[in-house]
From Swiss-Prot:
PANTHER family: THIOREDOXIN PEROXIDASE, THIOREDOXIN-DEPENDENT PEROXIDE REDUCTASE, MITOCHONDRIAL. Residues 8-165 form the Thioredoxin domain. Pfam families: 1-cysPrx_C (PF10417), AhpC-TSA (PF00578). This is Putative peroxiredoxin ycf42. The lineage of its organism: Eukaryota, Rhodophyta, Bangiophyceae, Bangiales, Bangiaceae. It is found in: Plastid, Chloroplast.
């Protein structure tokens, strides 16, 4: 990765950006800060018209309503131009395209966003980085995959639900594999024994 002085970490403010995106077959200028007071799933993918990428992008779109119900917007980003994004969106899924999406695809042609989020590799494309940003603009979760394998939309949704739960219940924490409805834990040496005793 091209990192320079970038040491972006969970718990830090997500770098704002302004860029051209494609949404509803139109070019629009968007800023990350446009989505303040919402959670944001910001995910990077290597290139348009590739192979693993459309499976991820369409999977997020197909689950969009689940994220929207949780006050969450999704933004996909690659180093392609907005014209490439539009052409891919105008290609149907049966031909390896995207068809219509429920969220914007952002053009990072100058690679500034990928650099800011420390996901640009030495080949000049973004690794499969994913960031969950809370309504205060703080990065609560980040993960980066190599190019050859995709991410789990279901796991992203689960983590988002866990983040929202602990933010609403600051005296509780979510154990491994937690899902809504599961038991949580009190982060206290004595009170936590109640969780472990019932596990």
């Amino acid at each position: 990765m091209i990192s320079g002085h970038n040491c972006l970490q969970v718990g830090q403010i997500a770098p704002d950006f302004s860029a051209t995106a494609v949404y509803d077959q139109e070019f629009k200028t968007i800023k990350l800060s446009d989505f303040k007071n919402k959670y944001v799933i910001l995910f990077f993918y290597p290139l348009d018209f590739t192979f693993v990428c459309p499976t991820e992008i369409t999977a997020f779109s197909d689950k969009y309503s689940d994220f929207s119900e949780l006050n969450t917007e999704i933004l996909g980003v690659s180093v392609d131009s907005e014209y490439s994004h539009l052409a891919w969106l105008q290609t149907d899924r049966e031909s390896g395209g995207l068809g219509d999406l429920e969220y914007p695809l952002v053009s990072d042609l100058k690679k500034e966003i990928s650099i800011a989020y420390n996901v640009l590799n030495s080949g000049g494309v973004a690794l499969r980085g994913l960031f969950i940003i809370d309504p205060k603009g703080i990065i609560q979760y980040s993960t980066v995959n190599n190019l050859e394998f995709g991410r789990s939309v279901e796991e992203t949704l689960r983590v988002l639900q866990a983040i929202q739960y602990v933010q609403a219940h600051p005296d509780e924490v979510c154990p491994a594999n937690w899902k809504p409805g599961d038991r949580t834990m009190n982060p206290d040496p004595i009170k936590s024994k109640n969780y472990f005793a019932a596990a």
